[in-house]
A protein has these predicted regions:
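A short, amphipathic alpha-helical segment
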Residues: 1-2, 617
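Bacterial N-terminal signal peptides that target proteins for export
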Residues: 2-12
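Hydrophobic helical h-region of N-terminal Sec-dependent signal peptides
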Residues: 13-18
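C-terminal motif of bacterial Sec signal peptides marking the signal peptidase cleavage site
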Residues: 20-23
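Bacterial lipoprotein signal-peptidase II cleavage site
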Residues: 25-30
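Mature catalytic domains of secreted/periplasmic carbohydrate-active enzymes
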Residues: 31-620
Length: 620
């Protein structure tokens, strides 16, 4: 349980997601009951007892073996009561240092107190590290445990997964993905009719905790399943929605489209044989919206993917396996976050029964329905077990090995990474797979009628260019309304992006990261949907700011301001090799240029460009 603040102790007790490291208990895939059970893998925890430390005054040291180069949380285990000085706990591990109050605390089933720091430790390499803790507190043990976003599996499926991932089919699909660079994400469903408002109350004003994005309507208002289902009776979008959206994606310069075939609410936009809670059987539309959009996208020369919430299903997925996970976590004193789980009106079946009867079959249905499907974008993996995650991946591969699977299938079985919702990784981060950032055009994924905080075209282009320069893809979201119409402010920004991309496409499609991502501009990380909503966008750009991509013998320097005067690109100095030719993409005019020890000097006199910027192509 969570503990209230004690006198003299600066604890910021917060409800944050923190789950134990789980794996499937049974090898019998057909055994629905045992597939819901799981056991903890505390063998992946590093436990350092106080009695084993080398003590020097109030300093305690251990030698620590890091076997997995991932992100860890640091916890301190106290016996019974807190010490008055327990806020003064300093931890040093290798080059890392933690000097802050604890972020959360809880009691174990043995009545011990576990306190955890908010700061995490990211180890990039395996090996030995020295850990030192300096404190006068009467602690019992130090725990170094994998952060909940970095579960460590048993490894028993790794070789089989790797063989599939490295297959010619998967690698060809990844080559396509790396070249595509820019895709459209679509969050659309029953919730789109409500526009983020339920019975006159805006979702932002909901009294319940949890995300306030429009597609979480059912969760935000704890709407009973049968009541929420009534929305299906009025869901009747315009028949032109598919062609309109496909054309918008094409005009925006996007190469692929990914739509929510089933979000957390459990409603399917396709004609499912496994459930009648779908577009054909439950709505007056009486047609397969996924198939229609798929065909419209193919007609526009676009590739197609589907989002599928496999872990969360508020209609048929009971409590999302919450009770089983919580039982294990309670025994370890680990808080189990209920966010995203239906605890107000769960279906009477087990979560494993939902997987067997609905989720696994629907994945196979989608792949068979869409022969040229490019990828499945899984979501809601929080309490999915290692065995279940692998089964989803293998099911996709066995049905069509050309279909890519994203990271959120769970347990690191994805073919590529996603950086997180509206998150762009640092240029210094080392990622072991190709990656993608998904982002919004305002502050919601689904249609929120009152959210007019639209990102400007310049802001969206900045995110896109920043992502490309770091070697990733950008999956940019739209949220159509209940009729399938895209808000004009959102569509306008996408079309303006498309006009810029059309001129500068040589610097975009098929490019890779250059030796450095940018110059002139200090890195400002986009750190989540809520972060952008709260902080806004205040960045400005000058003629000294450039982002780089490369392809073959060419380096592209991308500017986000109009072409004017003379520019100096420092990173293209003589140290990079001899530049043989320079041109401005989209212009037929020759430019005067000179490569020096200081950089590449280019005169832009007489060059016309978009107000959103230009691209210098340097051929080596």
């Amino acid at each position: 349980m969570y503990l209230s603040k004690r006198k003299g102790i600066a604890y910021a007790i917060a409800l944050v997601i923190f789950t134990s490291i789980l794996s499937c208990k049974s090898n019998n895939k057909a055994d629905a009951k045992s597939n819901d059970e799981a056991f903890d893998q505390t063998s992946n925890w590093i436990l350092l007892d106080k009695t084993d430390a080398i003590k020097d005054g109030n300093s305690y040291s251990w030698s620590v073996d890091i076997e997995h180069p991932i992100v860890y949380n640091v916890q301190v285990l106290f016996e019974n009561e807190f010490s008055e000085n327990s806020e003064e706990v300093n931890v040093n591990i290798g080059e890392h240092s933690i000097k802050e109050p604890f972020n959360k605390s809880y009691k174990t089933y043995k009545n011990e107190i576990v306190s955890e720091f908010k700061q995490t430790i990211d180890f990039n390499e395996i090996g030995k590290e020295k850990l030192t803790i300096i404190t006068d507190a009467d602690f019992k043990q130090i725990r170094i445990i994998p952060n909940f976003r970095n579960p460590i599996g048993s490894g028993k499926h790794h070789e089989e997964w790797l063989a599939m991932h490295q297959s010619p089919e998967k690698q060809a699909a990844l080559a396509w993905f790396k070249e595509a660079k820019f895709g459209m994400f679509i969050h659309w469903g029953l919730y789109s009719q409500a526009g983020g408002i339920w019975k006159g109350t805006k979702i932002n004003d909901s009294a319940y905790p949890g995300p306030k994005v429009a597609e979480w309507l059912m969760h935000a208002f704890r709407i009973p399943r049968e009541e929420y289902k009534e929305l299906a009776k009025t869901f009747n979008p315009d028949k032109s929605f598919a062609q309109n959206i496909a054309k918008l994606a094409k005009d925006a310069g996007m190469k692929y489209v990914v739509i929510t075939s089933k979000h957390h609410d459990g409603f399917a936009l396709f004609d499912s044989k496994s459930s009648d809670y779908d577009m054909v059987d439950a709505t007056p539309y009486k047609a397969d919206a996924i198939k229609e959009l798929y065909e419209a996208c193919l007609s526009e020369g676009l590739d197609f993917g589907v989002y599928y919430s496999h872990g969360n299903d508020w209609n048929d997925g009971t409590d999302g396996n919450y009770a089983n996970v919580k039982k294990i976590n309670d025994s370890l004193g680990i808080f189990t976050h209920p966010s995203g789980k239906n605890l107000w009106d769960p279906s009477p079946n087990t979560h494993a029964e939902y997987l067997e009867m609905k989720a696994y079959p629907q994945i196979k249905e989608l792949i068979n329905l869409l022969p040229k499907l490019r990828l499945i974008w899984f979501d809601g993996e929080g309490f999915i077990t290692e065995e279940q995650s692998f089964r989803f991946y293998k099911l996709v591969y066995d049905t069509n090995p050309n279909v890519l699977v994203n990271k959120r299938v769970g347990w690191d079985f994805g073919d590529y990474l996603d950086a997180g919702d509206n998150k762009i990784p640092s240029a210094d981060e080392t990622l072991d797979k190709y990656w993608e950032t998904c982002g919004t055009t305002n502050n919601s994924w689904g249609y929120k009628s009152y959210d007019d905080d639209w990102k400007s075209t310049q802001e969206l282009l900045y995110y896109f260019v920043d992502i490309m320069s770091k070697g990733g893809n950008y999956l940019l979201n739209i949220g159509p309304d209940g009729l399938g119409n895209v808000p004009e402010a959102s569509a306008k920004g996408l079309r303006e992006m498309g006009a810029w991309i059309k001129v500068n496409q040589e610097a975009i499609y098929g490019v890779s990261r250059w030796k450095i991502p940018n110059e002139g501009q200090e890195e400002t990380l986009l750190d989540g949907t809520g972060h952008r909503a709260a902080k806004g966008f205040k960045k400005t750009f000058t003629s000294k700011d450039f982002w780089f991509t490369t392809k073959g013998n060419k380096v592209y320097a991308i500017s986000l301001v109009p072409a004017s005067g003379k520019i100096l690109i420092h990173s293209l100095n003589k140290n990079v090799g001899v530049i043989k030719n320079v041109r401005i993409l989209g212009s037929e005019k020759d430019v005067e240029w000179k490569q020096t020890e200081s950089g590449l000097e280019v005169s832009l006199t007489g060059i016309e460009s978009s107000k959103y910027g230009f691209v210098v192509e340097a051929s080596l």
